Design a protein with these regions (language model features):
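ATP-binding glycine-rich phosphate-binding loop
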Residues: 1-41, 66-69
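Conserved structural core of kinase catalytic domains
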Residues: 69-120
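Catalytic-loop of the protein kinase fold
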Residues: 132-154
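Conserved end of the kinase activation segment
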Residues: 189-200
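Conserved C-lobe activation region of Hanks-type protein kinase-like domains
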Residues: 201, 210-266
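Terminal C-lobe "cap" of eukaryotic-type protein kinase domains
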Residues: 276-302
Length: 409
């Protein structure tokens, strides 16, 4: 057993703290908090030992791509005075990576120096699907699969998964406890229940992440009520009721968000999405299926991707999603301008417009909240509004326009 010196880097989570390993730049150590009860620590020790002995075979990486770590996987135990304290894992270079969450909005990606196009997004989706498939082949599931726990190498587009000691293992030789879950990525059959089918849960979360990556961050269960049925305000409630508005067959109860570009997706991708969100646990697309379908679009020499007249990458035979999105943004700006003209010309008619807006035509929570404020302020004012009130309303709507433009961008 080798003695090492650990140096704190000031990063601590719910279960433990991360340290660098002196003279070992490729590795870091996670030390569990001393406050963890002994029974829980013993469970961690059994799990980490199993993981060290059963590392999954990961997707091959070209030899020219040095230093890419796809899993922060345990490689050795850390013992303190003959007692289990934590584990050593390979270090992910945070300087070369960014949170996958940043790819859900182009502005955040640009702030990270990453120029987003649909070729890169599809490649990230493909690499993530391959990685999840490797885990499932070893009967390991992430369960709490979500963008914030994923890193993307900016140049190579490979994906890394953090917090591997939180994975759920369901092999014949060892079964671990199911981890905590995030409601926005939780399959409908597991709401208010334990996750009894971890791979099915991963399949749902994987499809959700892929949909969001390809659709400018829009969640697959974000939509607009199409009738007067009770419509949950929380995404988890919509997931539980199966209110998915982006299928090839339209839903009678909910409409797609106007900012969505899902109709620009190829049929093969839309079919996997529909199966993942509408067909139940048994028919949900596997990580292997996703990897197979996405592989042709991720290839640089693929004829399944083409360029539009403006030079944007698009799916061959489909409309350009970037051009469609630009049109949506321009249309939104024009509608805001027309509303300001209407407001100044006839405040009473503008109130009617805002009331109608609040009943289901809003495309974002920012607009809805702003419209409610706007409605209250207009109702309290006389029909002939003072210059001060008009100026206040203009300021409010200008702020709303900026916020909404940022959200759509």
């Amino acid at each position: 057993m080798e003695k090492v010196r650990l140096l704190s880097i000031g990063k601590s989570g719910g279960a433990g703290e991360v340290f660098t390993v002196e003279d070992q730049p490729r590795y870091v150590a996670k030390i569990y908090h001393a406050s963890i009860r002994e029974s829980q620590r013993a469970q961690y020790a059994r799990k980490i030992r199993w993981m060290i002995d059963n590392k999954p075979e990961l997707p091959a990486i070209p030899t020219e791509y040095q230093g890419i770590v796809q899993l922060a996987w345990p490689v050795a135990l850390v013992m303190k005075q003959a007692s289990f304290a934590g584990f050593v894992m390979e270090k992910i270079d945070f300087g070369r990576t960014m949170e996958l969450d940043y790819l859900l909005t182009r502005r955040q990606a640009a702030d990270e120096g990453f120029d987003v196009d649909f070729g890169k997004l599809v490649t990230v989706c493909h690499n993530l699907a391959c990685l999840i498939d490797c885990l499932h082949s070893k009967r390991i599931a992430v369960v709490d699969l979500k963008p914030i726990n994923l890193k993307v190498y900016k140049s190579e587009l490979y994906v890394s998964i953090l917090d591997c000691d939180g994975f759920h293992i369901y092999s014949d030789s060892f079964v671990s406890e199911a981890p905590q879950v995030t409601p926005e990525y939780l399959a409908p059959e597991f709401h208010e229940k334990a996750v009894t089918q971890p791979e099915a849960q991963d399949r749902f979360a994987l499809a959700t992440i892929i949909f969001r990556l390809l659709n400018y961050g829009i969640h697959p269960f974000a939509g607009i009520a199409a009738n007067r049925i009770p419509y949950p305000t929380e995404l988890s409630g919509r997931i539980k009721l199966g209110l998915y508005p982006y299928g090839k067959l339209p839903s009678a109860n909910v409409r797609a968000t106007p900012a969505s570009v899902h109709e620009c997706f190829p049929d093969s991708i839309r079919e996997l999405l529909d199966r993942s969100f509408t067909s139940g646990t048994g028919a949900r697309a596997s990580a292997y299926e996703w990897a197979a379908v996405l592989s042709s679009f991720a290839s640089k020499s693929s004829a399944d991707m083409s360029r539009c007249q403006k030079g944007h990458l698009q799916f061959a035979g489909k409309s350009c999603p970037c051009c469609l999105r630009e049109g949506i943004l321009r249309g939104h700006v024009e509608r805001q301008k027309r509303f300001m003209v209407r407001l100044q010309a006839s405040p009473a008619r503008a109130v009617t417009y805002v009331k109608k807006t609040l009943k289901g035509t809003q495309t974002s929570p920012f607009q809805a909240a702003l419209a409610q404020v706007q409605l209250n302020s207009v109702q309290l004012a006389p029909v002939t509004m003072s210059i001060r009130n008009v100026a206040s309303i203009e300021i409010l709507w200008t702020i709303g326009l900026i916020i909404t433009f940022w959200w759509l961008k």
